[in-house]
């Protein structure tokens, strides 16, 4: 019955975090959970708590962490003369060239649906930007930190290296 009264709102709700959580905080519709979270969780999950924290207070519980990764074929790497998976962006770019030289599409990407391409920029920006820069983007719509441009430059480097399969923008995920 609480859900039937728009004045009271729900006790528990799900949101995407970031600006959506901030809107709920600003509207007085979110409870400060800071003192209900153990110091261990605060320490070990500080990055995850960033998206639901404002002015040093925690207003949400992250229920998912979405790590990204790259699956690769050891056989294709071997065919291209690559002995190990890259561990740096520089190594990735070098391996892209080796794979391309061996006639292998380095990265298979289905970009027609947009979100897979967006993930590449997201992952690269996570690499370049600090939590503070992310918070300024979410809270203030301030993307003046050079990390955002660096992430775009990194993505352009991959495009210039012909890292993705031919026609990736018209290939479905």
Predicted regions located by residue number:
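Glycine-centered hinge/linker elements that transmit conformational signals in sensory
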Residues: 96, 138-172
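Loop/turn elements at helix/coil->beta-strand transitions in domains of secreted/extracellular proteins
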Residues: 6-11, 57-58, 100-106, 161-164
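Short aromatic/basic micro-patch
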Residues: 71
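Extracytoplasmic/periplasmic solute-binding protein
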Residues: 55, 59-63, 68, 90-140
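Aromatic-glycine-rich donor-binding/catalytic loop that engages nucleotide-sugar donors
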Residues: 75-85, 163
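Early extracytoplasmic/lumenal segment of secretory-pathway proteins
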Residues: 1-21, 90, 173
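Hinge/lid segment of periplasmic solute-binding proteins
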Residues: 16-68, 78, 90-94, 120
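Short, solvent-exposed loop/beta-turn-alpha elements that line the ligand-binding surface or hinge
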Residues: 32-44, 107, 111, 128-150
């Amino acid at each position: 019955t609480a859900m039937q009264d728009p004045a009271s709102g729900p006790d528990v709700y799900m949101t995407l975090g970031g600006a959506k959580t901030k809107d709920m905080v600003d509207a007085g519709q979110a409870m400060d959970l800071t003192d209900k979270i153990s110091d261990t969780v605060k320490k070990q999950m500080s990055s995850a708590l960033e998206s639901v924290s404002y002015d040093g207070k925690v207003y949400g519980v992250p229920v998912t962490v979405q790590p990204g990764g790259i699956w690769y074929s050891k056989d294709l790497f071997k065919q291209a003369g690559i002995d190990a998976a890259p561990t740096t962006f520089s190594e990735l770019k070098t391996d892209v060239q080796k794979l391309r030289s061996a006639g292998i599409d380095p990265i298979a990407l289905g970009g027609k649906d947009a979100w897979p391409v967006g993930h590449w920029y997201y992952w690269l920006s996570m690499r370049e930007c600090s939590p503070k820069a992310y918070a300024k983007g979410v809270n203030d719509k301030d993307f003046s930190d050079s990390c955002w441009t660096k992430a775009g430059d990194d993505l352009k480097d991959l495009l210039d290296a012909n890292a993705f399969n031919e026609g990736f923008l018209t290939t479905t995920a």
